[in-house]
Amino acid sequence: YVMGHFRWDKF
């Protein structure tokens, strides 16, 4: 996780 899982990290 980087920020949380809004866009890129959600994959």
Swiss-Prot record:
GO terms for cellular component: extracellular region. GO terms for molecular function: hormone activity. It comes from the Eukaryota. The keyword Flavoprotein does not apply. The modification Phenylalanine amide is found at F11. It is found in: Secreted. Keywords: Amidation, Hormone, Secreted. The keyword Transmembrane does not apply. Belongs to the POMC family. This is Melanotropin gamma. It comes from Theromyzon tessulatum.
